[in-house]
Amino acid sequence: MYRMQLLSCIALSLALVTNSAPTSSSTKKTQLQLEHLLLDLQMILNGINNYKNPKLTRMLTFKFYMPKKATELKHLQCLEEELKPLEEVLNLAQSKNFHLRDTKDLISNINVIVLELKGSETTLMCEYADETATIVEFLNRWITFCQSIISTLT
């Protein structure tokens, strides 16, 4: 009698582990999405750091919120919340000498990737650090976040 219950328990446990365990293809997909996010963030940062950017000093006056801790994909919620202000600052800075092509598309791509990576169920309330960050610091920290997560996946 107990033997049947034990076998049922083992079978259910195996089914649960098999269905919930991440597969190598899902890890690869996550890694690719993070790499795309990383490239988009680096593209924005490179455009801002361009030596011909006369609006950089103005851009540095805008402050962005950073999470106290960003170590998991769910923390991308905090990046998502700052995308609109980021887009607004980038649009303000557009000029003849400084032009990020398709800022709206870049931000939209980042938003789509972030939503896929963090999952739709995430309702994390971001705990922000007391100090704010400049646009350069903001982008550098999220770039470092992506690199860190990618390194754990490989």
Curated annotation (Swiss-Prot):
UniProt subcellular location: Secreted
Pfam families documented for this protein: IL2 (PF00715)
Single GO molecular function: interleukin-2 receptor binding
Organism name: Macaca nemestrina (Pig-tailed macaque)
SUPFAM superfamilies, per database record: 4-helical cytokines (SSF47266)
InterPro entries: 4_helix_cytokine-like_core (IPR009079), IL-2 (IPR000779), IL-2_CS (IPR030477)
GO CC entries: extracellular space
Protein's UniProt name: Interleukin-2
